[in-house]
């Protein structure tokens, strides 16, 4: 099976995509670059700007149009921050937020087995734990990104990060 990842946004997203690539590789998937045929397409979205949301939807629409039998996944900050809107995006077979990244592979395997569309966006909770996502290597970067903290406790009126990433939690 072949899987293609498309990552928008920050280095945290790059780190999390690296962890997802490792999980899929360990399950026997081959990681392919954008533009190649794949059985699964995963977009790790950014929602800091509306442009990121649009780009995520556009990329998944194209993936579904060019590979109608493929499983498409919308994950990351966009569905986490705007779950109702993301859940309505029918081009995504799996819609999930920033929590429980380890469940993505299991849900993709269910979809490949014929399971109906899955929307799994859990809201962030107070006391939520830091999710350890080990990354052994980065395919497309010469430097590794190490995630030491996630979230934000400030509630700036103009910023979506606390909504997308939840409360601050760290490795320590």
Where are these regions (language model features)?
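Proteins enriched for Cys/Gly/acidic motifs involved in redox and nucleic-acid/cofactor modification
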Residues: 1-172
């Amino acid at each position: 099976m072949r899987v293609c990842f498309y990552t928008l946004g920050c280095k945290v997203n790059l780190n999390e995509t690296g962890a997802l690539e490792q999980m899929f590789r360990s399950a026997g998937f081959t990681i392919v670059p954008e533009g190649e045929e794949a059985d699964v397409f995963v977009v790790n979205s950014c929602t800091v700007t509306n442009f990121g949301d649009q780009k995520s939807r556009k990329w998944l629409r194209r993936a579904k149009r060019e590979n109608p039998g493929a499983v498409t996944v919308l994950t990351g900050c966009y569905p986490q921050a705007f779950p109702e809107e993301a859940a309505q995006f029918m081009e995504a077979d799996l819609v999930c937020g920033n929590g429980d990244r380890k469940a993505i592979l299991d849900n993709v395997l269910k979809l490949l087995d014929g399971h109906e569309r899955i929307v799994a966006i859990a809201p962030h909770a107070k006391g939520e734990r830091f999710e350890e996502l080990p990354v052994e290597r980065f395919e497309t970067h010469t430097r590794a990104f190490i995630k030491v903290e996630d979230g934000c406790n400030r509630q700036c009126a103009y910023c979506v990060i606390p909504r997308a990433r939840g409360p601050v939690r760290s490795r320590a």
